[in-house]
Amino acid sequence: LYGRNTMGGIINVYTKSPLKYEGTNIWLSNGNYGYRDYALSHYKKIGEKFGYTVSGDFQSSDGYFTNLFTDKKADDMKSGSARIRLEWKPRKNLSIGLMSSFDRSVQGGYPYAVCDSVTHKPGEVNYNDYSFYKRTLSTTGFSADYQGRGYSINSRTAFQYISDHQGIDQDFSPKSIYFARQDMKQKMFSEELNIKSTTPGCYKWLFGAFGFWQGIDNTVTLDYFTKNYATRKLYDTPTYGVAFYHQSTIDDLLTRGLSLTFGIRYDYEHTSNDFLFYKETDGGSKQMDAFDSRLKFSQVTPKIALQYMFPSTGMLYATVTKGYKTGGFNTSFDREEDRTFRPETSWNYELGAKHPLLDNRLNAEICFFWIDWKNQQIYQMLATQNGQFLRNAGRSESKGVEVSLQGNPVNGLMVQVNYGFTHATFKDYKDERKGIDYSGNFLPMVPRHTFAVGADYTIPNPCRHIDRFTISANYTGTGRIQWKEDNKISQPYYGLLNAKVSATKDFITFAIWGKNMTGADYSAFYFETGGKGLAQKGRPFTIGGNIQLNF
């Protein structure tokens, strides 16, 4: 959890292997607001050395919020994907895999509504120009794993293509004032190779290398209808980078159960931006600006962790890591000094414990953390109020605690409780343009409290027609969330209640579910443009049902 762009950690996604699982899964789900979600997957093994997976899904929604001007939903959505995975194990110590996926998404865009100037609550969505977001995504990956005597070698090769198109009624009003369009194409190739020890013993090691190339072509067009002209900005931004890393772990250090891990990573990145700016009128197109800039970044990010495993399977741990997020070019700016933004770095300190209690019927976990940021990248509005750009805050910090309890108090009942408290503030952040000092204010978009409690109660064989009956409910709470650096507008704490009832017989499961069952009224997002505040409301109460078949 250290290195390039790992400020928020890393999520590993694991899917079923056709060499270990065979079968067909069908998922059908419908709900109100025209919600539909259909999926099909098939896993098959041919012989003992080869297997394949094919899957596809389709999801759509009529939308949740009506645009008063068009009398149509502003956030309708359709998306679909297809995926194939091949696995081949020519020898016991060699595995080869190939995965390819294709995704297409078409969405009505941005159900943002103007907020009341006093209460800051959003009104109704009401703008005249249809807004949209369309994306095509193709990803192909190749993997190879070799198990040698006392070591293993792993290779991951990937290529990704994204075609992105969006249009936004930038004034969000019934008037034709601004309309923004962005067309982006991205290609990325990456390769990661590592070798690690597999022999039993007190010392474990890992060495690795990573490299990538990324090319982004981006065109941003802004139509000024009342002024009878448009601006068009073209960005060609190729980026490449390499990284080398090592990690060592010593087990049973000084005493049994105590281990020490040390890691270090070096990243180098080069990015450039070929920029052209045109003003287009009825008389033609005129070039207003152009530049070709280059940026180079390099960073060493260490990690050290100490862990003690109790004989009872509990553990204590402490970690210190350095996080790193690269700098780059802004696609919107109105001052020369705002064309670029610097890298963001952080030192992350964590102290925690995990332990089973009450004969393993209860698992408890607690973690204290402190993050010390430098040059944190923060979005700010342009002086023209027609877009946002990234700039660096001097210094920020985030500290808090997370507590988790998982229990099985009686047979068939599982209960989970999670709570997190975060105190994230600017330590040194001055906006020279506005002459405002934000030091001491809370960071925007960071909830102060997060809370979740959930329970699942399963009744086996309640009758001869049902093998398993499950009742599930969960409550999640979030807030307060500050929307801006000045802390003048925020979302108070709110809670969402969800529930589901399911019944299983043989290979088929039926379920009925509800989300936001109390109809909580809250804002999911807030921003300001054109001198006014806009927000997107959270989704209302929804209800639906599922049918799942596994055979």
Which residues are covered by each model-predicted region?
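C-terminal beta-signal and adjacent terminal beta-strands/loops
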Residues: 372, 412-415, 476-484, 502-551
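Periplasmic-side early beta-strands and strand-to-turn transitions of outer-membrane beta-barrels
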Residues: 12, 20, 29, 40-129, ...
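Gram-negative outer-membrane beta-barrel transporters
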Residues: 196, 202-206, 254, 260, ...
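Structural signature of Gram-negative outer-membrane beta-barrels, strongest in the C-terminal barrel
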Residues: 87-91, 101, 195-198, 204, ...
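Outer-membrane beta-barrel proteins
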Residues: 29-37, 59-89, 124-137, 174-190, ...
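A beta-strand signature from Gram-negative outer-membrane beta-barrel systems
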Residues: 1-23, 550
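Membrane-embedded beta-barrel scaffold of Gram-negative outer-membrane proteins
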Residues: 143-171, 309, 315-325, 340-404, ...
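Outer-membrane beta-barrel channels and translocator barrels
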Residues: 46-48, 59, 89-93, 148-151, ...
